[in-house]
């Protein structure tokens, strides 16, 4: 196997290796790195794994890495893909998709200062099938296939050493690109998550190429053209025109023309560059394509056609504003007062032309921008130049001359950038200008002048005319660039070359007596006047700058050497074809004008060009009509946009498989074959096809799995494996989880394992352990599966059971039960435990992967509620510090302490009012809204630093205070006697208050039952009939998608801009209980106060405050009478006129929400307002879930680091581990490894710990994280402690090292140490390694006693074994010496165990034996435990099946399953109930076959909250909602028996399987019945169908997913001997 295919020197190399086991490794050897990294792609979930451990996934060479992967044998390699670069990776459902570049073209080989720009010549998608059976729709599979068909080759480029997303030379390093031009940002995230961001290149779309030019065979200069396409408005010709909600324009390209003179190594390089833009007109417009030969009809938006135009020019102004960068002294440039942006509009402006409307609006947009006052230092100027009309009337040459005339003034004013690259930074003292030094280059850049401003060209599509005009504009600049570099293009001078001078002057012929020479050091030219015997750097006769702008076409042609012009024209021709192909699917038209300077422009060529243009026109029309929508989808998916629409079930972050080695079984798994191993092959992916045969006498099989890392367990993945008879598979499974083996809790009981084909993957969702009390009070145990489907929670889960979340789970016990009473051996297949592991590596180092976890660690745990970031406990309160732009009045502040304020400390009323309003008044400025994502340009996570004084931490709040406040809310709505039935909106607002108070559903039900109220009576899901609820749910779902799209657009729009101002009205604007309109200036009066008896009016922060103008009815409305911004989105698709009729949502991609647009509640239909409140409640439910995740994450950190977490965490930007700790570790380890570091190692059992001690996990945390004064100690009452340490992996252990506590040891607390080793939890099988008395170490090493001296290496005691022992568990027993056992107890009075003031765990001294004044008992203590040795490479024993076992598995089944014919089947209740009617003489039914469902679980179920900082960054989300509360389905089977009564005979908890998988469920016993009923129960509402392209918001279809329909999905069967039933019956096997 040749690692390096023929044809290459040492360069970046990537090899994608697929082994016969199905495992995929990516071996990457970067040019910038001396070593090789191996990235493992998990074959189950597709997640990337990399630890950076030498010898495991970091090697010296590519060959060494491959030898390790293949065990030195190439026979196990299934396939290999050789590549030159990694372009991206994504896990898309059942596939991992790796994009690599297999062939590169060095399009710009050597930029000034180094760096090669590569164009992707050939690319390949490596499609990796995954074992995870996540349900995936057919549409998703189709979209994934379309993604792989995206045209990448020849149209994308990158540089792996320099930032080229900004004008040359960039001031930023490679890994800080400009996001506007990065096209694979989403695809690069997985590599950033594993700490290898540089392994995925930064990919740009567009064109990059260079041309050398010279004369007489000599190289004079190099011109390079780079065109960067913006991703702010990606898409195809008729789907991405004009401006969008991201303030980006369609087909927007930044072009850069770079010219330099190549020099020898060590010499400075002079260069200059010119930037221009091209793109469609930045207003809201489009074109409707007719299916005829006529032109498309152009239209401009009726409302706000210039919205976003100002932001577009702001982005340009910010990028090209270089007024303050030019050197203030010694340069020719004057100080610039403003930034010019010149728009050259090439559209047809003649009367009657279709493009005339665009010209008019373009001119009007200029007036709009100037009147806005938002660009005070920018001058936007429009030049209208009808290109086609000029060519038709005047011809091509005069058209070019006219363009030059218009461009002369702006081109000269904007100028170009000039500078030098200095190979040595020692020469910077001679630099006169801006100095750019970055780590990516060795030398430095010195820029003498900067281009200030930009010229922007456009036509209708920014294609053909734009390319031609930009060429002729760029040509004039190119000539001037050459002049300033000393390259003469004048024909009368020949093709001479004169060196650059400091003044940038052009070089003409030298006068008599003058001579030019080159400086030997810098390479610069200087001039000698032999007449006066003087020298100068400046040319004695500088030429006139920009002189060709005044020339006529023929004069230009005669006076200019045309070969460089031809080279430049060739670059523009290629560029034009690339951009035209990306935008229209065809090459550029009307390109023949670019060859006007050549001699081949005759009549025949003009005729050929006309034929070519006609052909391209027909190609464009076909592709735009038939292919554009597919290409648009491809681009969006490639960019990671609208994934909730195209790939709705794809998770943000795949789960980890934590059971795989180094996970292992704590007990050997019993097996019928004596030659088999201990069961480790059941956890190894290398034996995916294993069939494990358990002993025949086993009633149950119980497996104890120790996970490779602590995690929260989410799923159990079982691979069904059996012989010829599938009856050997287990029928049910129980799962228990816990941190230690003694505290396991039941999470799943009796989950069904159906019979299915060999090799089928079944997924069992695992919730956290649920309290039996919570299950009882919510009715989940008694009522969940008995309730009617009509009362299913369609809107949201009203009775959500909250399982415990624990990120330190380490032990999983899986118990399998056989089927039936007949004892036959069970067969097991591979077992995998999937979960979410906290990014410990990112926490322990300075990497970004710590993400949200590091934020939680540094955030004080002030409140368990996720809604504590606003001072009135309202996370959704809109910002009141801003004023409306329409009609507004000053905000009057109310009394911040109203008389009826509730006492949050006691939960009691602070006034005499018996039923006060549960509303805490807040007078605060904005910025505390957790859900104001539509009000900010960049949404940032809000910490709890704004928690007000009135809020109380959850753990300090009286137990019933939240329930008391909740009941007060209920009484304020239903009256003191609870006589009033709550309406839908009231019930929803009550739920909002419940979630604000951070009360769980179980706590709510417990409070309601305490006053005799059935929780079901206030369930909003049953407030309306099912038909209306279904419609409401559909609209809320559409709103969620539009809200997600709006957030996406908001984040993208913030690229290149400052933060935008907030909106006063938020996305929902839900009025709280007791709030309402008090009249005043409000003319709408939609939310009139209906204050119940006994409550005061709470009108708000703005009863006389801001007033807004409704854009529909044009009435003034107060804040309470305005609908949320989400209503604006829905109003465009679901108006009041269509509330009872049509109404569809053809494109759920969000149009922008204007900050100056408002809509009152009277102009919205009631169902739209109700959809807003439904979405609001869903968001709050999600926030509660994320709050629980945060609390669980914080608890895990406390358990590992203790209460003073921030002292233990690595500081961002500082190297970790520090050098001192690293040197100490290397010193005591030598050539051995540390085998017991958390999180890979942990404790098997709990270790007794004192209350003021560091956590016992701190004994194993990485050494560099150990606080200098913190240490672990046992309770004083414990005279011995046993710690069982499970090592990182199977290892050869040679010693145990005990780091001494800062207080040191004395004879009183120096323990005796006993150490055992074993490979499982069987204590009888462990081996004693030795017994040591620490007192003897103290006597021989006195430095072990007394306080630790600062600045010294940590004190330690090494317990060395006589011989290394291979084991997985080390048992350590520490025992205090018995009192009186030693007569030589002499305690140093200066020793104080806890006398260090810095110790966060010991505020007071505690032992007289160490110098304290109070006599206390000694205790066991230690600083850290290190287990040293060498890891044993995982060599899973291959289970060799004996001949008898193989014969047993191959035996044919005695009974087969046969189909029971039916009279009829009747679907009912939205197809969630299916009744099967059997024929009178049917055989006894033994079970049923269920074909797995096709419905999906969407990731987006509500509008996003503001804690989503970056939709591409999974580190901002620790755990998705779908795993916090997993959706579980059940199927209930009932039969009709005597007295015509349906009797339930069985209920099955369904696993997840791929669509269409045949699942066979046996009944508990065979049944004889005329009718069998099947009912689907559980979290039915969590599943949906794939979104359609057009969503009918008012349809009366079933509110449940059609993919869950039981119709034609269930078959009954019976068992029979195939030889007894006959040949014909055998054909009916099921």
Curated annotation (Swiss-Prot):
Key words of the record: Hydrolase
Database matches in Pfam families: SAC9_C, SAC9_C8D, SAC9_GBDL_1st, SAC9_GBDL_2nd, Syja_N, WW
Tissue: Ubiquitous. Most abundant in the roots with lower expression levels throughout the leaves and shoot.
Gene inactivation effect: Characteristics of a constitutive stress response, including dwarfism, closed stomata, and accumulation of anthocyanin and reactive-oxygen species. Accumulates elevated levels of PtdIns(4,5)P(2) and Ins(1,4,5)P(3) in roots. Hypersensitivity to salt stress. Late flowering, shorter roots with less lateral branching and low fertility. Abnormalities of cell wall and membrane structures in primary root cells.
Annotated EC: 3.1.3.-
Domain of life of the organism encoding this protein: Eukaryota
InterPro entries found in the cross-reference section: SAC_dom, WW_dom, WW_dom_sf
Coiled-coil region: none
Segments forming domain SAC: 147-527
Hydrolase found in the keyword field: yes
Function, as annotated: Probable phosphoinositide phosphatase that could be involved in stress signaling.
PANTHER family in the record: PHOSPHOINOSITIDE PHOSPHATASE SAC9-RELATED (PTHR46817), SAC DOMAIN-CONTAINING PROTEIN (PTHR46817:SF1)
Domain notes: The phosphatase catalytic core motif (or RXNCXDCLDRTN motif) from the SAC domain is found in metal-independent protein phosphatases and inositol polyphosphate phosphatases.
The protein's name in its UniProt record: Probable phosphoinositide phosphatase SAC9
Organism: Arabidopsis thaliana
């Amino acid at each position: 196997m040749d690692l390096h295919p023929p044809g290459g020197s040492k360069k970046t190399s990537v090899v994608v290796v697929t082994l016969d086991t199905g495992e995929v490794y990516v071996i990457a050897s970067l040019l910038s790195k001396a070593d090789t990294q191996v990235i493992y792609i998990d074959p189950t979930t597709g997640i990337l794994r990399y630890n950076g451990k030498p010898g495991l996934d970091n090697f010296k060479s590519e060959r060494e890495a491959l030898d390790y992967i293949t065990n030195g044998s190439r026979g196990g390699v299934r396939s290999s893909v050789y590549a030159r670069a990694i372009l991206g990776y994504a896990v898309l459902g059942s596939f991992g998709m790796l994009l690599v570049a297999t062939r590169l073209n060095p399009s710009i080989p050597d930029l000034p200062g180094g760096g090669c720009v590569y164009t992707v010549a050939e690319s390949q998608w490596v499609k990796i099938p995954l074992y995870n059976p996540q349900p995936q729709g057919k549409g998703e599979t189709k979209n994934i296939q379309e993604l792989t068909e995206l045209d990448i080759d020849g149209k994308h480029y990158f540089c792996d050493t320099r930032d080229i997303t900004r004008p040359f030379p960039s001031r930023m390093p490679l890994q800080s690109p400009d996001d506007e031009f990065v096209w694979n940002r989403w695809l690069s995230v997985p590599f950033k998550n594993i700490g290898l961001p540089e392994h995925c290149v930064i990919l740009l779309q567009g064109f990059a190429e260079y041309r050398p030019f010279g004369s007489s065979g000599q190289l004079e200069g190099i011109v390079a053209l780079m065109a960067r396409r913006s991703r702010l408005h990606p898409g195809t010709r008729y789907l991405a025109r004009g401006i969008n909600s991201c303030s980006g324009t369609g087909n927007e390209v930044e072009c850069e023309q770079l010219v330099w003179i190549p020099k020898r190594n060590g010499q400075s390089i002079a260069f200059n560059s010119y930037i221009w833009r091209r793109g469609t007109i930045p207003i809201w417009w489009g074109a409707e394509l007719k299916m005829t030969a006529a032109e498309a009809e152009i239209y401009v938006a009726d409302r706000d056609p210039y919205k976003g135009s100002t932001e577009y020019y702001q982005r340009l102004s910010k990028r090209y504003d270089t007024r303050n960068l030019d050197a203030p002294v010694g340069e020719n440039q004057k100080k610039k007062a403003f930034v010019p942006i010149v728009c050259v509009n090439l559209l047809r402006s003649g009367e009657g032309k279709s493009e005339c409307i665009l010209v008019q609006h373009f001119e009007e947009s200029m007036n709009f921008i100037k009147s806005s006052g938002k660009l005070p230092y920018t001058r936007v100027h429009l030049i209208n130049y009808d290109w086609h009309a000029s060519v038709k009337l005047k011809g091509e040459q005069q058209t070019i001359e006219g363009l030059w005339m218009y461009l002369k003034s702006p081109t000269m004013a904007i100028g170009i950038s000039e500078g030098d690259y200095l190979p040595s930074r020692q020469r910077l003292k001679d630099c006169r200008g801006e100095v750019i030094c970055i780590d990516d280059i060795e030398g430095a850049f010195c820029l003498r002048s900067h281009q200030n401003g930009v010229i922007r060209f456009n036509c209708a599509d920014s294609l053909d005319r734009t390319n031609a005009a930009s060429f002729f504009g760029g040509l004039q600049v190119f000539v001037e660039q050459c002049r300033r570099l000393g390259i003469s293009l004048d024909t009368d001078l020949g093709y001479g070359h004169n060196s650059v001078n400091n003044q940038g002057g052009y070089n003409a012929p030298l006068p008599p007596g003058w001579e030019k020479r080159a400086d030997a050091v810098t390479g610069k030219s200087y001039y000698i006047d032999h007449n006066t015997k003087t020298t100068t750097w400046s040319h004695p006769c500088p030429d006139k700058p920009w002189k060709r702008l005044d020339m006529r076409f023929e004069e230009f042609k005669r006076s200019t050497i045309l070969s460089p012009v031809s080279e430049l024209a060739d670059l523009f021709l290629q560029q034009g074809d690339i951009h035209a192909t990306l935008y229209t699917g065809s090459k550029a038209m009307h390109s023949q004008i670019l060859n006007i300077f050549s001699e081949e422009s005759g009549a025949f060529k003009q005729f050929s060009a006309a034929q070519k243009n006609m052909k391209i026109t027909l190609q464009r029309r076909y592709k735009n009509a038939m292919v554009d929508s597919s290409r648009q989808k491809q681009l969006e998916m490639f960019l990671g946009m609208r994934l909730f629409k195209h790939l709705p079930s794809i998770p943000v972050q795949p789960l980890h498989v934590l059971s795989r080695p180094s996970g292992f079984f704590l007990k050997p798994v019993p097996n019928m074959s004596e030659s088999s191993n201990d069961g480790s092959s059941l956890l190894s992916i290398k034996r995916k096809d294993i069939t494990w045969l358990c002993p025949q006498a086993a009633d149950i099989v119980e497996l104890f799995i120790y996970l490779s890392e602590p995690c929260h367990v989410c799923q159990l993945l079982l691979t069904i494996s059996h012989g010829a008879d599938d009856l050997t598979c287990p029928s049910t499974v129980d799962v228990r989880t816990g941190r230690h083996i003694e505290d396991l809790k039941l999470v799943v009981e009796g989950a069904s394992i159906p019979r299915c084909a060999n090799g089928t993957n079944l997924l069992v969702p695992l919730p956290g352990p649920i309290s039996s009390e919570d299950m009882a009070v919510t009715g989940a145990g008694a009522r969940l599966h008995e309730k009617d489907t009509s009362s299913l929670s369609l809107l949201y889960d009203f009775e959500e059971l909250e399982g415990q979340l624990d990120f330190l789970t380490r032990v999983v016990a899986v118990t399998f039960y056989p089927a039936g009473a007949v004892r036959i051996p069970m067969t097991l297949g591979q077992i995998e435990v999937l979960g979410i592991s906290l990014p410990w590596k990112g926490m322990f180092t300075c990497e970004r992967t710590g993400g949200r976890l590091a934020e939680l660690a540094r955030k004080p745990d002030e409140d368990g509620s996720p809604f504590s970031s606003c001072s009135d406990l309202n996370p959704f309160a809109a910002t009141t510090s801003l004023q409306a732009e329409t009609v507004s009045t000053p905000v009057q502040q109310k009394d911040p302490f109203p008389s009826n304020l509730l006492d949050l400390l006691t939960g009691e009323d602070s006034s005499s009012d018996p039923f006060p309003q549960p509303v805490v008044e807040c007078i605060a400025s904005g910025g505390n809204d957790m859900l104001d994502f539509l009000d900010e340009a960049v949404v940032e996570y809000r910490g709890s630093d704004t928690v007000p004084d009135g809020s109380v931490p959850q753990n300090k709040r009286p137990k019933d205070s939240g329930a008391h406040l909740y009941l007060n809310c209920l009484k304020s709505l239903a009256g003191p006697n609870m006589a009033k039935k709550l309406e839908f909106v009231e019930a929803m607002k009550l739920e909002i208050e419940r979630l604000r108070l951070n009360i769980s559903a179980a706590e709510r039900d417990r409070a309601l039952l305490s006053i005799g109220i059935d929780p079901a009576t206030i369930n909003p899901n049953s407030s309306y009939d099912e038909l209306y609820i279904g419609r409401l749910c559909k609209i809320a779902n559409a709103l969620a998608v539009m809200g997600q799209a709006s957030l996406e657009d908001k984040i993208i729009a913030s690229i290149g801009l400052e933060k935008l101002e907030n909106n006063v009205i938020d996305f929902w604007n839900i009025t709280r209980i007791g709030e309402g309109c008090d009249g005043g200036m409000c003319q709408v009066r939609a939310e009139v106060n209906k204050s119940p008896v006994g409550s005061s009016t709470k009108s708000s922060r703005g009863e006389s405050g801001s007033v807004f103008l409704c854009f529909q009815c044009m009435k003034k409305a107060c804040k309470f009478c305005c609908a949320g911004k989400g209503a604006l989105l829905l109003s465009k698709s679901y108006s009041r006129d269509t509330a009872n009729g049509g109404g569809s949502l053809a494109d759920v991609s969000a149009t922008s929400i204007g900050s100056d647009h408002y809509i009152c509640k009277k102009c919205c239909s009631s169902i739209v307002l109700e959809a807003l409140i439904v979405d609001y409640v869903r968001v709050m439910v999600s926030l509660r879930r994320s709050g629980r995740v945060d609390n669980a994450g914080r608890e895990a950190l406390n358990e590992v680091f203790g209460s003073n977490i921030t002292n233990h965490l690595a500081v961002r930007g500082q190297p970790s581990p520090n050098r001192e700790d690293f040197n100490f570790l290397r010193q005591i380890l030598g050539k051995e490894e540390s085998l017991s570091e958390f999180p890979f190692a942990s404790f098997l059992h709990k270790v007794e710990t004192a209350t003021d001690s560091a956590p016992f996990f701190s004994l194993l945390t990485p050494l560099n994280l150990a606080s200098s004064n913190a240490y672990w100690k046992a309770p004083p009452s414990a005279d011995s402690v046993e710690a069982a340490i499970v090592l990182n992996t199977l290892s050869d252990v040679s010693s145990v090292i005990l780091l001494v506590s800062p207080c040191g040891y004395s004879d009183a607390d120096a323990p005796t140490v006993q150490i055992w080793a074993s490979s499982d939890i069987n204590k009888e099988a462990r081996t004693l390694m030795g017994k040591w008395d620490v007192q003897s170490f103290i006597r021989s090493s006195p430095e072990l006693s007394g306080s630790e001296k600062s600045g010294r290496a940590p004190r330690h005691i090494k317990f060395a074994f006589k011989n290394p022992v291979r084991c997985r568990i080390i048992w350590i027993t520490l025992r205090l010496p018995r009192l009186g056992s030693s007569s030589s107890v002499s305690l140093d009075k200066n020793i104080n165990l806890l006398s260090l003031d810095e110790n966060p765990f010991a505020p007071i001294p505690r032992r007289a034996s160490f110098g304290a004044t109070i006599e206390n008992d000694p205790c066991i203590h230690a600083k850290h435990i290190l287990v040293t040795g060498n890891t044993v490479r995982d060599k899973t024993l291959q289970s060799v099946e004996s001949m008898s076992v193989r014969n047993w598995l191959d035996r044919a089944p005695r009974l087969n399953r046969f189909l029971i014919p039916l009279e009829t089947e009747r679907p009912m209740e939205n197809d969630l109930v299916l009744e099967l009617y059997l024929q009178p003489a049917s055989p006894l039914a033994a079970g049923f076959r269920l074909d797995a469902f096709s419905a999906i679980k969407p990731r987006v179920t509500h509008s996003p909250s503001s804690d989503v900082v970056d939709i591409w960054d999974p580190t901002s989300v620790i755990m998705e909602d779908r795993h916090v509360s997993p959706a579980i389905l059940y199927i209930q089977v009932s039969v009709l028996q005597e007295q015509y009564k349906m009797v339930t005979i069985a209920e099955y908890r369904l696993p997840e399987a791929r669509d269409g998988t045949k699942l066979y469920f046996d009944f508990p016993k065979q049944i004889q019945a005329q009718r069998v009923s099947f009912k689907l129960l559980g979290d039915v509402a969590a599943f949906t169908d794939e979104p359609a392209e057009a969503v009918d918001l008012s349809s009366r279809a079933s509110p449940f997913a059609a993919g869950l329909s039981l119709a034609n999905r269930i078959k009954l069967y019976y068992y029979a001997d195939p030889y007894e039933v006959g040949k014909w019956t055998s054909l009916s096997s099921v």
